[in-house]
Regions:
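Intrinsically disordered, low-complexity regulatory segments
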Residues: 1-108, 193-196, 203, 312
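Hydrophobic (often cysteine-bearing) scaffold residues that line and stabilize catalytic clefts
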Residues: 45-49, 94, 98, 128, ...
Length: 400
C-alpha cells in the first residue's frame, strides 16, 4: 500500500497551544481588522507558522510582512517603514510548505517501507526514516565503517639537532623526491614526506647522518593572513564548540537570547557570512557603539578602527550576491548589559570577528631551512620551519 500520498494535507490544532490558536483566530476574524501584519520569525519556518494560522482561520485579509534583522527599537521602526508585500513572500512560503510536506511524505513512506523490509523475516522491527535524519545517519555509519576498517601501521621519523654559531636548531628528515600518492582516486593521508615505513631504514639514516656536517639552504618569504569571514550560525556553533565546548543547541539558545532578550546581536539563524553593500554606515555606527561601550577588551580596538578609517566597503565583507534572507551575525547598535558568562562569551566571539574583518591582514615572515647532510655521494635533507609575526593586524584583537 505504498506510496501514501494524500490528496491534501489537513491541519489540526496542537492541543497544548489550542487556546492561543483560538485567540489568534478570533482576532483575525474581527470585523474592525482590515489588514494583517505577519511579524512571525523572519525566516522560512516563521513564514510557515503564519500561513498555517491564517489558513486555519480562513483569513483572506490583506497581509504585509514585517522582516526584522535585529530586535532593537530602531530596527523595529525601520521594519515597519519597509513592510514587504505578501506576493514577495510567496516563494519563501512555498519552500516552507514543500519542506513540511516532504518531511511527512518521506517519513511515512520511508518508515513503513524500511520497517516492512526489516520485519520480513519475522517480528516487528520499526525503522524510522527521515528526510534529514537518515542521510545524516548514513554519514555517521560511513565514518564508523572507515574507523572499523582502519589498520594501524607503525612509521618512524628522524629528527636531528644541528649546531651553528647562533645556537642550536632542530630539523626533521624528509624525502626530497616525495610525491603525494593516490589511493582509490584520492590523496592518501597516511603518506607524508617525513614518514619512514621501515625501522631499519630510519636507523640507517640516523647512522649515516649522526655527527656529520651539513649544508644549509634558507629561504624567507613574507606572507599575509586575512581574518576569517563573519559568522553565520554554523560557523559560530563550530567556533563556540571548539573554544568553549558549547553544543550546537546551546550556542543557538545563547545567540537567540542575545537577539531577542538583550537585543545585542542580529538575527542568528542565518546562512550568510556577508553584509549588504549599503550597510557601511550602520557598521560605522556599530564601531562607534563598541568604542563608547565601556567594554575594555573591545573598545580600544574599535577606536583604532575608527581612527585609522579601517571601516570601508570591502568586497569580501559587503556582497549582495551572498546575502539571502538575512546577513551575517553582527553586534547591533545596542550595547550589551546584564549578560550571563556564557552569553558574554558568545557576544565576544561575534564582536571580535566583526571588528577583525575590517582590520588589515596579519603579516608573517616564514623561513624554511633545508639542511643537507651528505655521505658517500648521498644527501639526506632535514627541514626546519619558523614563522615570525611581523605585524599583528587583525590578530591584535585576539591579544597577539
Amino acid at each position: 500500500h505504498l506510496p501514501v500520498i494524500p490528496p491534501h494535507f489537513d491541519l489540526l490544532p496542537i492541543e497544548k497551544t489550542e487556546s492561543r490558536l483560538k485567540l489568534l483566530t478570533k482576532l483575525l476574524k474581527r470585523k474592525d481588522v482590515t489588514a494583517v501584519i505577519n511579524a512571525c520569525d523572519a525566516g522560512r519556518e516563521g513564514e510557515l507558522i503564519f500561513r498555517y494560522i491564517a489558513s486555519h482561520a480562513g483569513s483572506k485579509k490583506p497581509v504585509k510582512r514585517l522582516w526584522l534583522q535585529s530586535m532593537t527599537p530602531a530596527s523595529i521602526k525601520d521594519g515597519f517603514k519597509h513592510l514587504r508585500s505578501d506576493e514577495e513572500m510567496l516563494p519563501l512560503a512555498d519552500a516552507a510548505i514543500c519542506r513540511s510536506e516532504a518531511d511527512w511524505l518521506v517519513g511515512i513512506n520511508g518508515t513503513r517501507a524500511m520497517t516492512a523490509f526489516n520485519s520480513k523475516s519475522g517480528g516487528f522491527h520499526k525503522t524510522p526514516v527521515g528526510r534529514v535524519q537518515t542521510p545524516t545517519l548514513a554519514i555517521l555509519v560511513e565514518r564508523e565503517e572507515k574507523i572499523k576498517r582502519f589498520v594501524p601501521k607503525d612509521y618512524w621519523e628522524v629528527h636531528a639537532t644541528f649546531s651553528v654559531t647562533a645556537g642550536d636548531y632542530v630539523g626533521r628528515w624528509i624525502d626530497e623526491k616525495f610525491a603525494k600518492a593516490k589511493k582509490d582516486g584520492e590523496a592518501d593521508p597516511d603518506l607524508r614526506a617525513e614518514r619512514i615505513w621501515e625501522e631499519k631504514r630510519a636507523q640507517a639514516i640516523k647512522a649515516k647522518c649522526e655527527g656529520k656536517p651539513g649544508i644549509i639552504e634558507e629561504e624567507s618569504k613574507p606572507t599575509t593572513q586575512a581574518s576569517p569571514l563573519l559568522f553565520d550560525l554554523t560557523s559560530l556553533q563550530r567556533e563556540a564548540n571548539g573554544r568553549f565546548g558549547f553544543s550546537a543547541k546551546t550556542t543557538l539558545a545563547l545567540a537567540q537570547s542575545l537577539y531577542e532578550r538583550h537585543k545585542a546581536l542580529t538575527y542568528p539563524r542565518t546562512d550568510s557570512r556577508h553584509l549588504p553593500e549599503d550597510y557601511v554606515p550602520v557598521v560605522k555606527q556599530t564601531f562607534e557603539m563598541l568604542a563608547d561601550s565601556g567594554l575594555k577588551h573591545l573598545a580600544p580596538h574599535a577606536l583604532v578602527a575608527l581612527n585609522q578609517s579601517y571601516v570601508r566597503k570591502i568586497p569580501r565583507v559587503f556582497d549582495n550576491r551572498k546575502v539571502s534572507d538575512h546577513f551575517a551575525i553582527i553586534p547591533t547598535l545596542q550595547a550589551p548589559s546584564g549578560l550571563s558568562e556564557a552569553e558574554q562569551k558568545i557576544y565576544d566571539l561575534v564582536a571580535r570577528r566583526f571588528m577583525a574583518v575590517f582590520f588589515p591582514s596579519a603579516e608573517h615572515l616564514v623561513t624554511t631551512r633545508i639542511t643537507q647532510v651528505g655521505h658517500a655521494g648521498i644527501s639526506h635533507h632535514f627541514k626546519s620551519e619558523g614563522k615570525v609575526l611581523v605585524k599583528p593586524g587583525w590578530q591584535a584583537i585576539y591579544g597577539k
